[in-house]
């Protein structure tokens, strides 16, 4: 047996050392995250505290890539998200008339909110649906209540 590992020595020794954990995996993880030389075997009473101290910096490093860049302050991040064009929600086929009308009013028929970077709008009031064309909020609600439309219970 030319290359014996720590676990092989523990198996051969037997006795009190047979209960000792194999620290090979922990050593490899420590080397991976830059904690070389930490081969100390934790004591029974202190194991959870030691594990949380060792794991806290690694989980923090792992989640940093998913967060926003550190050069953006929270205020800048907020305004960037507020001013960027929003995508229309995915439309479901089985929507009721009221929710469809509200969605159309909020998002518009072309899927873009009015004045939020809608492409192809030359005038500033092209996306506005108001009293002139009769497709505002109240008009759409009153159109829903016409006879012959809606659920069979209302007719």
UniProtKB/Swiss-Prot annotation:
InterPro entries, per the entry: Myelin_BP
Please give the chief subcellular localization of this protein: membrane
Kindly list any coiled-coil regions of this protein: none
Keyword annotations: Acetylation, Cell membrane, Citrullination, Hydroxylation, Membrane, Phosphoprotein
Processing and modification events after translation: Several charge isomers are produced as a result of optional post-translational modifications, such as phosphorylation, deamidation and citrullination. Dogfish MBP contains four major components designated as C1, C2, C3 and C8. C1 and C3, but not C2 are phosphorylated at either Ser-121 or Ser-122; C2 is phosphorylated at 2 or 3 sites among Ser-135, Ser-139 and Ser-140. Hydroxyproline and citrulline are present but were not identified in either C1, C2 or C3, which suggests their presence in C8.
- Here the segments flagged for biased composition (Basic and acidic residues) are 37-49, 123-134
**Pfam families given in the database record:** Myelin_MBP (PF01669)
Where is the PTM N-acetylalanine found along the chain?
Answer: 2
Question: Any idea which residues bear Phosphoserine here?
Answer: 73, 84, 121-122, 135, 139-140
GO CC annotation: what is one? myelin sheath
Q: From the UniProt record, which GO molecular function terms apply?
A: structural constituent of myelin sheath
Superkingdom is Eukaryota
Span list, region Disordered: 1-72, 113-155
Q: Deamidated glutamine-modified residues are where?
A: 12
Indicate how the chain sits in the lipid bilayer: Peripheral membrane protein
Q: Where in the cell is it found?
A: Myelin membrane
Query: Its family?
Result: Belongs to the myelin basic protein family.
Function according to Swiss-Prot or TrEMBL:
This protein may function to maintain proper structure of myelin.
UniProt-recorded name of the protein: Myelin basic protein
The gene it comes from is MBP
């Amino acid at each position: 047996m030319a290359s014996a590992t720590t676990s092989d020595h523990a198996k051969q020794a037997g006795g009190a050392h047979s209960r000792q954990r194999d620290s090979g995996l922990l050593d490899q993880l420590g080397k991976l995250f830059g904690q070389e030389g930490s081969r100390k075997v934790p004591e029974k009473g202190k194991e959870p505290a030691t594990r949380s101290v060792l794991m806290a910096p690694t989980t923090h490093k792992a989640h940093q890539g998913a967060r926003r860049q550190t050069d953006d302050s929270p205020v800048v991040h907020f305004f960037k998200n507020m001013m960027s064009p929003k995508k229309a929600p995915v439309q479901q086929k089985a929507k009721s008339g009221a929710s469809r009308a509200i969605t159309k009013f909020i998002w518009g028929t072309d899927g873009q909110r009015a004045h939020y970077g809608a492409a192809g709008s030359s005038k500033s009031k092209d996306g506005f649906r108001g009293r002139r064309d009769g497709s505002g909020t109240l008009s759409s609600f009153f159109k829903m209540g016409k006879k012959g439309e809606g659920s069979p219970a209302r007719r």
